[in-house]
Regions:
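Conserved Walker A/P-loop ATP-binding site and its immediately adjacent core
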Residues: 72-105, 189, 279-281
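Walker A/P-loop
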Residues: 58-79, 346
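Conserved strand-helix element at the start of the C-terminal RecA-like helicase core
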Residues: 85-95, 246-289, 416
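Conserved segment of the helicase C-terminal RecA-like domain
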Residues: 381-413
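Conserved SF2 helicase motif VI
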Residues: 187, 362, 370-394
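Post-DEXD/H (motif II) to motif III coupling segment of the RecA-like Helicase ATP-binding lobe
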Residues: 152, 159-223, 416
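Conserved helicase ATPase core of P-loop NTP-dependent helicases/translocases
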Residues: 97, 111-122, 141, 274-276, ...
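Conserved interdomain linker/interface between the two RecA-like ATPase lobes of SF2 helicase motors
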Residues: 208-273
Length: 430
């Protein structure tokens, strides 16, 4: 009939850029307000109400809000107000699990199911899954037949999902879901597929940066300090990851300087201290330098395996970790840390994104790299505002005599400055 069909998220772009007239043929079912199972102990902030109103007015749209501004609370309220069959996708198991616990608490186990990490409770009104599990659902399977009938699709931290993964879920399993809402701290991409993401998510109807959240009194202010240090190792490699490992992760001087920051923050300032690391071995080397009780949040550890002749077949990471730390329940450890049961929490990527860490007043960032997404997600672990907390110190390290690491540190400083500058630089022996 001479008309073109496009992804519905492209509607605003086509109308504003080319002056085209579009027609929306999507049918939206009537909402059915759900009763609270347990009423939340807080009411939405005005900006959360604005974000929710913008999404519900547009029906297919996204919001961009800095980490710590309560995107998951908006998600919960939208799911309750619509009361329709809903699938919520998180980018990781840790984020999915946090959402699941919140939804079960406030809407009831009767209505909330989980589809991730081996859980396959997909027949509930609201199902929360992670991207990995949802993309593996085969067409025609019982899970597909049930979940493909969802009327609402919501994606939390949508920028952390590859655009191709998001497209597979939105155009496959959830192709018939009319209501579509996307939540993220930023929609920036590392994969160059920004236009595809825009077509999937639709227009941004509300945005608030971390700086805006701090200035308006909703977030704790991150105070950034970068310590210039050095490496005395002679190791050289064309592999930036290997250089980071040798000159930052396993740098004895950096580890001792980090330990000094951690111990002094606890002893002199009375701070709860969060340490973000990339590899288990960093914990193994840092822990003996710390003077206080420490929690360690990590994923499954692997044991070293051997050939019949006794030679190592595959080296694991469990043997280097004290046995008392072999088992880890990240969400439980975060709760204990928030409750003040121990003053130091060291964590790998399992807690660096989408984890509700509240009481941290000093964060030590030992992950290196230059990913804007990873750095901003890490900083987001310390911006939650709670009684008695208005600011959080963020400490990073610049191994100044190693060119590639100093280049990465410069990139992180620029990210810090963009979040909430200025950044203080302190020379501790470069």
């Amino acid at each position: 009939d001479g008309r073109y069909w496009v992804m519905s998220g492209q509607r605003d772009y086509l109308e504003s850029r080319y002056g085209l007239t579009t027609e929306v043929l999507v049918k939206y079912p009537e909402p059915h307000l759900m009763a609270w199972h347990e009423v939340p102990g807080k009411t939405p902030y005005p900006y959360q109400e604005k974000a929710k109103a913008g999404l519900l007015a547009r029906l297919h749209a996204r919001v961009e809000m800095g980490t710590g501004l309560g995107k998951s609370f908006i998600l919960l309220n939208i799911a309750r107000e619509l009361g329709l069959r809903t699938v919520i996708m998180a980018p990781s198991t840790s984020i999915a699990d946090q959402l699941y616990q919140d939804f079960v608490k406030h809407l009831g186990r009767k209505y909330v199911g989980a589809y991730y990490d081996g859980k396959k409770d997909f027949k509930k009104l609201i199902v929360i899954g992670n991207a990995q599990s949802l993309t593996r659902i085969e067409e025609g399977s019982p899970a597909w037949e049930t979940m493909s009938k969802a009327q609402v699709f919501m994606a939390d931290e949508s920028h952390l999902c590859p655009a191709s993964t998001l497209n597979r879920v939105c155009s496959g399993l959830l192709a018939d879901a009319p209501y579509r809402f996307f939540f993220s701290a930023t929609q920036m991409r590392n994969d160059g597929l920004d236009k595809l993401l825009d077509a999937i998510t639709g227009p941004t109807v509300y945005s608030m940066t971390v700086k805006e959240g701090v200035d308006q009194g909703y977030l704790s202010k991150p105070v950034f300090r970068v310590i210039k240090t050095r490496s005395d190792k002679n190791f050289e490699s064309d592999d930036a990851n290997e250089m980071t490992r040798e000159h930052l992760y396993y740098n004895t001087l950096v580890l001792h300087q980090a330990a000094e920051v951690i111990n002094q923050s606890v002893e002199r300032l009375g701070h709860q201290v969060l340490v973000l690391i990339d590899e288990v071995e960093q914990f193994t080397r840092l822990r003996p330098l710390l003077n206080h009780k420490t929690g360690f949040a990590h994923g499954p550890l692997t044991a070293t395996t051997f050939h019949e002749n006794g030679k190592i077949k595959a080296k694991g990471n469990r043997e280097s970790v004290p046995k008392e730390y072999w088992e880890s329940e990240p969400n439980k450890l975060v709760d204990q840390f928030n409750a003040g049961e121990f003053p130091i929490l060291i964590g790998t990527s399992c807690i660096s994104t989408g984890t509700d860490i509240r009481t941290v007043k000093t964060m030590v960032y030992l992950k290196g790299g230059k990913s804007e997404i990873e750095v901003k997600q890490g900083v987001g672990r310390c911006t939650r505002k709670v009684p008695g907390k208005t600011a959080c110190s963020v400490v990073d390290f610049d191994v100044a005599n190693i060119a590639i690491l100093s280049k990465h540190a410069k990139a992180r400083r620029e990210i810090f400055d963009d979040i909430y500058g200025p950044v203080q630089v302190v020379d501790w022996g470069s």
